[in-house]
């Protein structure tokens, strides 16, 4: 079959729309007709060269849609089911899935290669194999993916909104609730309140934090964060640190969450300094893997028992937490509709990312 997709051929170039050949589902695979795709900053790391994938690759790793066809042996979904895609597949049988760390599933090893777990590809054109970002390629009308990459959701939920819980919402919310282990009465500092960080605000608020202090240079994002539950907002880290010192009587924050678009050593150092004894720094944002971004005093960590840790997918369980977050939304306890700043069609994908670069969007969504 044929499908239109937004393809990246090399770093530094825009996405190109083209028609590709798409294989139908094999054993354990499903054909998804995508309804919506989120414009996440992680795809910008491909275009900027920070995360070098195998080119060419169909972009997009935040998606929702309807199952059109299933291959042999598929048990998780059936044709007609509404699904949200998880950018980390979860097999349920590897060491990490079996010990409750489904976000680290071994099937995620090829997410930048864009191939299926057996090394084969489902997108092709004129003899060339095209990868799919995170084995999903949601910047396409249709895709064939593993059944382990989709999560069935209630069919009365709007897929254009549900798409957000495939990456940005759990990554941010879980950074606060799971990785940050925030509790009632805590003080949290959040660096970067875009598509991920704004959901860390929601997570910290849901956890019962007394103070949620955000840092972002973009005024629009700071204003939005205050509407989502932040108690204080600052354009720079130094001003935020001074306020935290005042609010906590010099004790420091309980957790500092780093969700900026590109992590550097400056923000990591600021986060490590703003937490108090026994505090935790969680790094969820990405950077060029070849660059060292953690330069802190080991003595400070030892004497004050501070922790610096990373978090992938908000340390969530995709099969459980995607459904849980949508139920919170359905109950009016999680804001999703308010996250969508602008909707685009597939032809506008590059404009959507330019708007993201310009700080105009909390979250842009492509509606297929």
Curated annotation (Swiss-Prot):
Protein name: Putative alcohol dehydrogenase D
Gene that this sequence comes from: adhD
A GO cellular-component term linked to this record: cytosol
A Pfam family per the record: ADH_zinc_N
Similarity comment: Belongs to the zinc-containing alcohol dehydrogenase family.
Gene Ontology annotations of biological process type: biological process involved in interaction with host; formaldehyde catabolic process; response to acidic pH
NCBIfam families given in the database record: Rxyl_3153
Protein's UniProt keywords contain Zinc: yes
């Amino acid at each position: 079959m044929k499908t239109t997709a937004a393809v990246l051929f090399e770093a530094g170039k825009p996405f190109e729309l083209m028609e590709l050949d798409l294989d139908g589902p094999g054993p354990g695979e499903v054909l998804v007709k995508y309804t919506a795709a989120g414009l996440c900053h992680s795809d910008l790391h491909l275009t900027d060269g920070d995360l070098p994938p195998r080119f060419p690759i169909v972009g997009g790793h935040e998606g929702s849609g309807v199952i059109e066809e299933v291959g042999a042996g598929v048990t998780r979904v059936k044709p007609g089911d509404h699904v949200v895609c998880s950018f980390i597949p979860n097999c349920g049988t590897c060491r990490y899935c079996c010990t409750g760390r489904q976000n680290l599933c071994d099937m995620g090893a090829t997410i930048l290669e864009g191939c299926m777990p057996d090394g084969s590809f489902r997108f092709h054109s004129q003899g060339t194999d095209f990868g799919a970002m995170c084995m999903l390629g949601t910047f396409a009308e249709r895709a064939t993916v593993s059944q382990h990459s989709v999560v069935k959701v209630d069919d009365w939920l709007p897929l254009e909104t549900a798409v957000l819980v495939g990456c940005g919402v759990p990554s941010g919310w879980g950074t606060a609730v799971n990785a940050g282990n925030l509790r009632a009465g805590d003080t949290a500092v959040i660096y970067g309140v875009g598509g991920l960080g704004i959901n860390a605000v929601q997570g910290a608020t849901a956890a019962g934090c007394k103070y949620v202090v955000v840092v972002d240079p973009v005024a629009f994002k700071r204003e939005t964060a205050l509407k989502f539950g932040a108690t204080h907002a600052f354009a720079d880290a130094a001003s935020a640190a001074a306020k935290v010192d005042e609010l906590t009587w010099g004790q420091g924050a309980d957790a500092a969450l780093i969700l900026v678009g590109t992590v550097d050593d400056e923000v990591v150092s600021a986060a490590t300094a703003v937490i108090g004894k026994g505090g935790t720094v969680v790094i969820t944002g990405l950077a060029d893997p070849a660059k060292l971004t953690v330069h802190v005093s080991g003595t400070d960590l030892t004497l004050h028992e501070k922790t610096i840790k990373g978090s992938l997918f908000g340390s969530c369980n995709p099969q459980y937490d995607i459904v849980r977050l949508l139920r919170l939304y359905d109950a009016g306890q999680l804001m999703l509709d308010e996250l969508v700043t602008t909707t685009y069609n597939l032809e506008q994908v590059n404009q959507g990312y330019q708007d993201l670069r310009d700080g105009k969007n909390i979250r842009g969504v492509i509606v297929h």
